[in-house]
Amino acid sequence: MKRLLTTFLLATMASPVLAFPVTVDSCGNQVTFDAPPERMVVHDINMADMAFALELQDAMVGVTGISGWYKTSAEFDQRRGDIPELAPKYPTMENLVAAQPDLFFAGWYYGMRPGGEVTPETLEAQGIKTLVLSESCIHLDQARPAASMDLLFDDVLRLGTVFGKQAEAQALVDGWTSQLETIRQSVPEGEATRVFLYDSGEDQPFTAGKYAITTAMIEAAGGTNVTGDMETSWGRTSWEAVAAANPEFLILLDYQGGDGAEGLLAFLKAHPVMSQTDAVKNENFVALRYEELTPGPANIAAIEKIAKAIKGGAS
């Protein structure tokens, strides 16, 4: 009996019971959970990747905003398994309520629009809690700090707290931090390479600004974002402003539809001002997928791709 009691005590000490309730921040709002959610819906491929990294599939009853925009990878499909897609793009309240979720993990312009049908306030009225993607908070709170990799780290740690997986979340962040340090040590000293990210748009380019995690990723890879002074996360600027900065390197976003990155490059090569920039003339670019450039686990490998491509001078 004494041996059994000792074994029980040692097991209890090694695996402490995680205390609930827990309270976390969501764009300045405090959200309290009395127990881990059991019926979460996740919007967008990058946020689904966060949930999958913490192996939360058993607590998910749906995803939204996947097939309407992207072609997924075989790995994503395997990890998603039989979790249904409730809406191919932005969900309606009807889509969500029908799944009877207790949590919606989304963001502003990542499944929700300010003043729209689906917001934390309208969901709360239905008994559904919301965790808002930190990168997107800038759309309602102009006092946010400039982008850093904490946008990813903090969201994963928060998700771990909510689901009682703090240790697993911390292990992920520690591993990513170590990888980033290795990348940092590989970046040559000297002036940062001028980088332009081209997402979409012909009359005006849609790109990453001061509060987008992509700006922090570019910096971690040894570059500087030529549109990094835009007071937004994602937005539009002018071709003239981009060309005046004379980017030396391009990141082309490949949504896996149409002609992808090659089509973007062809457009830039035919453009009257962008065709004169060093990056376009030398065809120095790397093509990356959406989930690599929005907050999610794929960011880390993407930073390494950018760093290697910049050093190599071309994709």
What label would you give each PLM region?
Residues K2-F8, A14-M50, T161-Y198, A309-S315:
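Bacterial Sec-exported substrate-binding components of ABC uptake systems
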Residues S26-G28, I83-E94, P114, M230-W239:
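Short helix-initiation/N-cap motifs at beta->coil->alpha
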Residues D34-P37, D44, A48-D49, M93, ...:
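Extracytoplasmic/secreted envelope proteins and their assembly/folding machinery
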Residues V42-A99, L103-F104, W108-M112, V226:
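A short, structured surface patch at a secondary-structure boundary
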Residues W69, T207-W234:
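Alpha-helical, coiled-coil/dimerization segments enriched in small aliphatic residues
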Residues Y110-V118, I128-R158, E191-I213, A261:
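Extracytoplasmic ligand-binding site segments that recognize negatively charged/polar headgroups
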